[in-house]
């Protein structure tokens, strides 16, 4: 559906002139823009209550970018599968979604996204998770990072009150 304008229903409701006016003002607020696609992986994500990107009440996000070279993609994928299995075995309360870099990204990476109420809640659940996984988890993370070419993390928040999703017809 890359050829479809997902904002078309909004433009139709607002009118082209009003819609353009919003973006004319918005365009003065930043100087760089890029588009890319990441693909959510059900196979690699750990969300025992069902895979969803809408984690109500948990709008804080921690994004872990695991950059990988082509020769290590499969090895890293296998370690992420092992990590998911360990989370399942231990009944971890910290859930994560895994995305894979796709169209428009520079470099290849797996992206692990963890939701929490706020930064303090993230630290608390991460500490509890580390304690739960113990030495087995520590070793698995060390093994996994042998295949990571570069690591970056970012944190931020979601704004559901500012979100727009076109209705499906």
Predicted feature locations:
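Short S/T/G/P-rich N-terminal loop/turn motif that feeds into the first structured element of a domain
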Residues: 1-138, 142-169
């Amino acid at each position: 559906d890359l050829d479809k304008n997902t904002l078309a229903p909004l433009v139709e409701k607002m009118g082209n002139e009003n819609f353009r006016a919003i973006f004319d003002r918005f365009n003065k607020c930043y100087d760089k823009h890029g588009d890319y696609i990441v693909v959510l992986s059900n196979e690699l994500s750990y969300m025992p209550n069902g895979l969803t990107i809408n984690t109500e009440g948990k709008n804080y996000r921690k994004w872990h970018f695991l950059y990988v070279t082509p020769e290590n993609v499969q090895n890293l994928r296998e370690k992420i599968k092992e990590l998911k299995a360990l989370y399942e075995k231990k009944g971890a309360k910290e859930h994560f979604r895994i995305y894979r870099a796709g169209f428009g990204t520079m470099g290849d990476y797996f992206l692990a996204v963890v939701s929490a109420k706020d930064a303090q809640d993230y630290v608390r659940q991460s500490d509890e998770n580390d304690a739960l996984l113990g030495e087995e988890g520590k070793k698995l993370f060390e093994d996994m990072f042998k295949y990571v070419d570069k690591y970056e993390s970012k944190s931020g928040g979601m704004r559901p009150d500012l979100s727009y999703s076109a209705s499906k017809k």
